[in-house]
């Protein structure tokens, strides 16, 4: 049995439960998912670089006190979250974030990838994170923001949120030229159907949480691990 730890790096339990409700219905065979929400001293949402740094520090302290007994890590935050790099430096076990998993999956399915996300502040942050993966603008159509804060995805009226998601997805396709769309927030995990209805049956909608689970399960099955030669070598080993 492959054990994957799905980490919500914010302290909002409702977001963890939302991701769990989707993943529990599509877990691959012989895979066991375990879930961890950031302890209460962490941020309630990841809305800026500082939030990411804070949550990574809180979670790494948690792992010092509670060594993880799993085969892989999925960081369920759509950002270039520092916890991904920190876990890769600390463990040999495969680790990915949902941003990385969704982009790699999307590039297997189309030629122009766009991300529908939350606040406008995330547009440059996600653009920088995706470029840091080595993804060029020849295949990256850009970031389309709804203007909603992550927690507003569930706190605002459902019809209002759905309408914003639909309009933003259509903008990504019609104005930005996207032929694949990634859900740019873990809080959108249960909203893929809204975008699918808006853009029609020819545009794949990628949920990074699902893509991340499938990617990590494949890496573990192939007995692959995080490279320890280079940037992810153990601290102090060079």
From Swiss-Prot:
Q: Which domain of life is it from?
A: Eukaryota
Species of the source: Schizosaccharomyces pombe (strain 972 / ATCC 24843) (Fission yeast)
Listed GO cellular component terms?
cytosol; nucleus
- Give the family, as the similarity comment puts it: Belongs to the HyuE racemase family.
Question: What is the protein name stated in its UniProt record?
Answer: Uncharacterized protein C1F7.10
Q: Any idea which GO molecular function terms this record carries?
A: amino-acid racemase activity
């Amino acid at each position: 049995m492959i054990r994957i730890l799905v980490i919500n790096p914010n302290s909002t339990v409702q977001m963890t439960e939302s991701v769990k409700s989707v993943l529990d219905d599509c877990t691959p065979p012989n895979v066991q998912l375990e879930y961890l929400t950031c302890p209460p001293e962490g941020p309630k949402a990841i809305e800026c670089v500082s939030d990411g740094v804070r949550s990574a520090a809180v979670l790494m302290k948690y792992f010092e006190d509670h060594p993880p007994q799993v085969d892989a890590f999925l960081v369920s935050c759509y950002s270039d979250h520092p916890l991904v790099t920190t876990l890769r430096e600390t463990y040999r076990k495969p680790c990915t974030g949902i941003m990385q998993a969704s982009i790699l999956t999307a590039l297997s399915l189309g030629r122009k990838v766009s991300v529908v996300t939350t606040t406008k502040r995330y547009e440059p942050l996600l653009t920088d994170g995706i470029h840091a993966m080595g993804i060029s603008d020849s295949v990256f159509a850009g970031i389309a923001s709804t203007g909603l804060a992550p927690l507003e995805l569930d706190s605002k009226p459902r019809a209002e949120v759905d309408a914003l998601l639909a309009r933003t997805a259509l903008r990504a396709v019609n104005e930005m030229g996207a032929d694949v769309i990634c859900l740019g927030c873990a809080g959108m995990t249960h909203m893929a159907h809204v975008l699918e209805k808006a853009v029609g049956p020819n545009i794949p909608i990628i949920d990074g949480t699902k893509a991340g689970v499938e990617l990590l399960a494949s890496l573990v099955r192939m007995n692959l691990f995080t490279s320890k030669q280079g940037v992810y070598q153990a601290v102090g080993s060079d």
